Each structure stands twice: as structure tokens, then as C-alpha cells.
């Protein structure tokens, strides 16, 4: 079933982004989301805005993988505004590992600094001031 696969894939992505803090994401039939840290269930209303944004990122990436047979480019526009530096780094590592073409639009320098620190792939930067 698509719902089970979506939960599994989104959980896998979220666990990687959060450094294993959240081991499972469950989206029920009413589209209510819950997180699990170990055996403890947490409603998403109890987590930070950054974690909520990471949940949505994981769900979007999982849905994209499940719905498209071919690899699609990933286009992100100020997606990481509420991420802390560690989770941003984890997310950029995940993107580099699993995605072939990623376009990141942002008004911040953090993404560029972390990508350079990690020496991830080929990068082209356009600065508009």
C-alpha cells in the first residue's frame, strides 16, 4: 500500500536528517502526523518549527520517490530557514547522497558555507544583491 511505503520512506529520510532522534513518522488515514522517538509517540504540535519543516521535507522527498519512476530535479526555495546547522548539514548530505540534481534558492550564506565545508559535488552560485 502507498501509505505504508510513504510512512517507511519518510521515516527513513527524517531519521537521517534528525541524526536518529526521530525514528518513525506515521501519517494516518486522516493525514494526522505523529513522530516516534524510540517507543515514545509525539504529536507534531509538540515539536519546533524547524522539525515540522523537516517532516514536510521528508514527506515531499518520499512522495517524489514513490510517485516518479525517473529521477526528478529537486528545486528548493528557502526550505532551510528554520533548520539548525546540524540538521541542515544532515539534509545537504542526504541530498548529495540520494539526488542527482538539486537547485537551492536562498537568501542565506549557510547552505553555501556548509556545502563548501563538506566538499559536496559540483556547485554553481549566483549572488543577487
PLM features: residue spans?
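Terminal ABC-like ATPase head and other globular end-domains that cap long coiled-coil arms
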Residues: 1-129
Amino acid at each position: 500500500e502507498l501509505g505504508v511505503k510513504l510512512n517507511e520512506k519518510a521515516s527513513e529520510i527524517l531519521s537521517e536528517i534528525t541524526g536518529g532522534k526521530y525514528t518513525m513518522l506515521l501519517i494516518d488515514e486522516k493525514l494526522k502526523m505523529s513522530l516516534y522517538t524510540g517507543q515514545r509517540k509525539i504529536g507534531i504540535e509538540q515539536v519546533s518549527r524547524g522539525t515540522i519543516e523537516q517532516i514536510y521535507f521528508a514527506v515531499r522527498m518520499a512522495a517524489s520517490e514513490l510517485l516518479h519512476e525517473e529521477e526528478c530535479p529537486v528545486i528548493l526555495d528557502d526550505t532551510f530557514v528554520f533548520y539548525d546547522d546540524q540538521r541542515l548539514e544532515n539534509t545537504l548530505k542526504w541530498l548529495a547522497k540520494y539526488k542527482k540534481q538539486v537547485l537551492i534558492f536562498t537568501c542565506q550564506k549557510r547552505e553555501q558555507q556548509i556545502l563548501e565545508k563538506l566538499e559536496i559535488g559540483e556547485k554553481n552560485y549566483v549572488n543577487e544583491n
